[in-house]
């Protein structure tokens, strides 16, 4: 796909058929249509008074969409991971890992001396993740069942926590971010990757987009400071935050 081009009719059909983005079980259900056709799980908390409603979470029944071939061009996962300062020996977390699309790519980057916690709120997603881990022999990937307000991660253990198209689905973002802040090392970083809410040409439902200003404002209120912003991906922001202690 050319970065600057709109999706073809065929591509739009893919979005309509299988809605998600790789996230917190949590893959969102991004699509041009206003009608979702993939199973979703309603946000577990009432709408927050922050100008938006948490998006619904895609069910594990639509998990095949997370590994669609088109995702390589649309989201450029390897370029994204190369830009977020991962290194051998790190302990990292893929929050809302789903079937492990990013976690399995992170595993060889941190290497045998590192580890990748792959968290998700759906046990069924973790079952599929464990199968993928076994097939790939990714012994340093550790599946973790998380919750709306609990990360399931050890305290002060994480160098980099990654949330790809996940944050906008959190039903209790303040509580979850507080738990995630506790899981980060003092110099740890939180990386948000979200579809650009500023760009109407991004063919994603509005509830599955965020403007950079909105994300930065909400993270600041939760005690995180923006330290880096990258905009080279076709459709998504990369926002890197440090916890304020």
Regions found by a protein language model. Give the residues of each.
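A short acidic, Gly/Pro-enriched loop at the edge of an enzyme's catalytic core
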Residues: 151-161
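Class I SAM-dependent transferase core
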Residues: 25-93
